[in-house]
Amino acid sequence: FKPLLFKAFTLADRAVRTILLKILPKVAERLTKYEIQDKIYPNLVTGFLDTDITVRTETLLSISYIMDKISDRQLNNDLLRYLAKLQADTNPKLRANTVVCLTRISEKMQPTTCIGVLITAFGKALKDPDYVTRLCAIRGFESSIDYFSPEICCSKVLSSLSPALLDKSSVIR
């Protein structure tokens, strides 16, 4: 079963990749860290660059199922680069899901990386034209507030959040 799964992840066929991404939650628990890191992850992240929105979305959603098994380098370098690109995606739902994904993986990030990444990502999301993405950023700050010292909260977090008090959407205010 495993060799076939690893081979299938190397295929470029979108239909196959989408199905693999949808079943990943069921098979990820049966795979070792090594298998995720070396056989699945390198092929999985190519889905972030796909032109099809379904593949990009399924790739993003699958990250939460493998985040415990990918290496620190894969999480803190490679994955964060892909997520930064997704924040500029044309699809608002994908941008919102990117913020949610960042919030989820923040507990696995290196502390030195986490603070800067979250402030930058949530700050950018708060300027997004889509109110759902802005709301996800506010909830992301709320969920990760323990990562920030009082000094950082006052100097960076509040300065990112304060324009939301004047947001045109009442949900955001």
Task: List PLM regions with ranges.
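Hydrophobic residues within the alpha-helices of tandem HEAT/HEAT-like
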Residues: 5-9, 23-31, 47-48, 62-70, ...
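Core helices of alpha-solenoid repeat scaffolds
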Residues: 1-5, 33-42, 72-81, 111-119, ...
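Fold-core signature of tandem repeat domains
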Residues: 24-27, 36, 40, 55, ...
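Alpha-helix N-cap/helix-start positions at coil->helix boundaries
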Residues: 14-15, 34, 51-54, 73, ...
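Alpha-solenoid helical-repeat scaffold
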Residues: 115-173
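Core solenoid repeat modules with strong leucine/isoleucine-rich periodicity
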Residues: 1-26, 30-32, 37-38, 43, ...
